[in-house]
Amino acid sequence: SRCTHLENRDFVTGTQGTTRVTLVLELGGCVTITAEGKPSVDVWLDAIYQESPAKTREYCLHAKLSETKVAARCPTMGPAVLTEEHQIGTVCKRDQSDRGWGNHCGLFGKGSIVACVKAACEAKKKATGYVYDANKIVYTVKVEPHTGDYVAANETHKGRKTTTFTVSSEKTILTLGEYGDVSLLCRVASGVNLAQTIILELDKTAEHLPTAWQVHRDWFNDLALPWKHDGNPHWNNAERLVEFGVPHAVKMDVYNLGDQTGVLLKALAGVPVAHIEGNKYHLKSGHVTCEVGLENLKMKGLTYTMCDKSKFTWKRTPTDSGHDTVVMEVTFSGSKPCRIPVRAVAHGSPDVNVAMLITPNPTIENDGGGFIEMQLPPGDNIIYVGELSHQWFQTGSSIGRVFQTTRKGIERLTVIGEHAWDFGSAGGFFSSIGKAVHTVLGGAFNSIFGGVGFLPKLLMGVALAWLGLNTRNPTMSMSFLLAGGLVLAMTLGVGA
């Protein structure tokens, strides 16, 4: 699965009868949805971008100077005059120079002098700013079912589906082939203040240098370089890259301050680099909050017969995925298709299956299958696939796992924010409370009661509530009632 290869992975586990779950998707992360009676699905935010954003200013990094002219007058003869002084695209400077008999003046004193030079910009020496439009930013979300096929990190799963969302998008339904349909309704949010963000792009001159950065609008507007708007042929403040020398009689030198690319690159050290792909300008941060409908998903292979247990061999022995799960792959030499008999037992409990399958109902197909992912309790375990067995020690602790999943649930609810609550009606408010409980405690509940059936969990919740009603100690009574209520809510709830 896609999520197996990513470091930032989250699990959202639906309880019995779950039809909808709420996810928080962020760039670089991946969420695996598991629910009883449903295929597991990976969902991730693949990209945030805008096509062809609008240009704002262009800055010149290296001036191109030409047609230098100088005019001078003797003392008392009035100001020097050049017609170019009032032409657009020309940089001029007025000053006073020492005049006398040695340079063709009858009087000694200060005379007027003016120098002008035509200023343009060297080719491939521009820095251009682009602005985002929140209404045109596209969020690409991808969905992939767990089919039991191993897919390398650099390969694309044949069942992968892609959809896009904008601020005006509505619900999308994706067809996952034999696994049914999944619906997505996503609310988008960029991780940056778009009104204050500029993409600064340099003309491409060297392959080893980055070409674009995500900068603040105020910093961009304060750059001390010549600038112009798109389509304007003349540069404003061109004098910023021109220096005039000290005047001598009828002469004034003009100097080009040279290429400012290195100065700009030094100023951009540590600034987030922007990614540009063709005409797509990507954002580096942001998230979407998606409500995923699971009601039309269906498990594949439930009618298959069980595989012959003696005809399995390891293709990839059990390995730690890095996400508190175990992954493995087997090959099968018997008749296909069929269901893979897989289970795991803990030390001292040989009759209790402790494996929580992330790949539900693993199968061998005519053209693939055999990849299995599962979660095991901390400690010594033995994994069985048919007659194959493998001893496995799962690191960590049950308490630590509960705290970790609860922390992730709180983070998820915090990101969802105000969208998690419906104050429009009493029913909506209580539904929001149920959803919040599922979001925060769903993972912890599954860690504790993952191997317990629906009826035992229901009876446990009822028993705790009954103890709470019949206990005279107020503290004990409230504790039992709260615990019983949570167990019943997590057992009977249909949304996470």
UniProtKB/Swiss-Prot annotation:
Entry keyword set: Clathrin-mediated endocytosis of virus by host, Cleavage on pair of basic residues, Disulfide bond, Fusion of virus membrane with host endosomal membrane, Fusion of virus membrane with host membrane, Glycoprotein, Host endoplasmic reticulum, Host membrane, Host-virus interaction, Inhibition of host innate immune response by virus, Membrane, Suppressor of RNA silencing, Transmembrane, Transmembrane helix, Viral attachment to host cell, Viral envelope protein, Viral immunoevasion, Viral penetration into host cytoplasm, Virion, Virus endocytosis by host, Virus entry into host cell, Zinc
Q: Which residues are glycosylated?
A: 154
Name of this chain's protein: Genome polyprotein
Q: Where is this region: Fusion peptide?
A: 98-111
Disulfide topology = 3-30, 60-116, 60-121, 74-105, 92-116, 92-121, 186-290, 307-338
User: GO CC terms on record?
Assistant: host cell endoplasmic reticulum membrane; membrane; viral envelope; virion membrane
Q: Which residues lie on this side of the membrane: Cytoplasmic?
A: 469-479
Give the domain of life: Viruses
One annotated GO biological process: clathrin-dependent endocytosis of virus by host cell
Q: Which SUPFAM superfamilies match?
A: E set domains, Viral glycoprotein, central and dimerisation domains
| Membrane-spanning residues | 448-468, 480-496
Question: CDD domains, alphabetically?
Answer: Flavi_E_C (cd12149)
Q: Which residues lie on this side of the membrane: Extracellular?
A: 1-447
- NCBIfam families referenced in this protein's UniProt entry, alphabetically: flavi_E_stem
Q: Mind listing the GO molecular function terms for this protein?
A: protein dimerization activity
One Pfam family of this protein, by short name? Flavi_glycop_C
